[in-house]
Amino acid sequence: MKIYIIDNGGQWTHREWRTVRDLGVDSTIVPNTVDADVLADADGIILSGGPASIESEISKLGNIKEYMHRYNYPVLGICVGAQFIAIDSGGRVSKALHAEYGKKIVNFTSKDGIFYNIPDSINAWENHNDEIKSISDDYIICAYSDTCRVQAFYHKNRDIFGVQFHPEVNNTEHGTTIFKNFIEKCRR
């Protein structure tokens, strides 16, 4: 099994890689500009977080649109990766009314997809100025915080998932469970 971590310049990309590796899966970090052919053997991809603002710097996200549409593997978007999935689906992302930094309580309204075996509420690590305002009807919004309406989502028919928070950071409760559940989707 092989999962590629697509590096969008996030400060915790190596933590995503290490978490997947520590769960026994071959994983490789690649820049978001790598040719899509490199990902032909992927069983899944993780779109890392990063400092780019979707509103003004979407070009800094390289080829991730092609990665999502060329192959039919599971995708997990984290932070700006999730925001890209929302934009790509026809949703809207813009500056957050309240930027989130540090621990926040994230509440789950549905625990399907990769969000099973997680309590109804968790402490999660946040680090974002932009947020998802809307997403296509093809997705289910399944988690929120008191200041961010879309903390997690999943596609109704495909294995595409997104989280605004950072499950790779130790301060996020049950973050490893989210990665384990994603890996299980990649095994199918």
Swiss-Prot record:
Pfam families from the UniProt entry: GATase
GO function term, MF aspect, one: GMP synthase activity
UniProt pathway annotation: Purine metabolism; GMP biosynthesis; GMP from XMP (L-Gln route): step 1/1
Catalytic residues (positions): C79 (nucleophile), H166, E168
Enzyme Commission (EC) number: 6.3.5.2
Domain of life: Archaea
Listed GO CC annotations: cytosol
Keywords associated with the record: ATP-binding, Glutamine amidotransferase, GMP biosynthesis, Ligase, Nucleotide-binding, Purine biosynthesis
Catalytic activity: XMP + L-glutamine + ATP + H2O = GMP + L-glutamate + AMP + diphosphate + 2 H(+)
Oligomeric and partner information: Heterodimer composed of a glutamine amidotransferase subunit (A) and a GMP-binding subunit (B).
Listed name of the protein: GMP synthase [glutamine-hydrolyzing] subunit A
Organism: Picrophilus torridus (strain ATCC 700027 / DSM 9790 / JCM 10055 / NBRC 100828 / KAW 2/3)
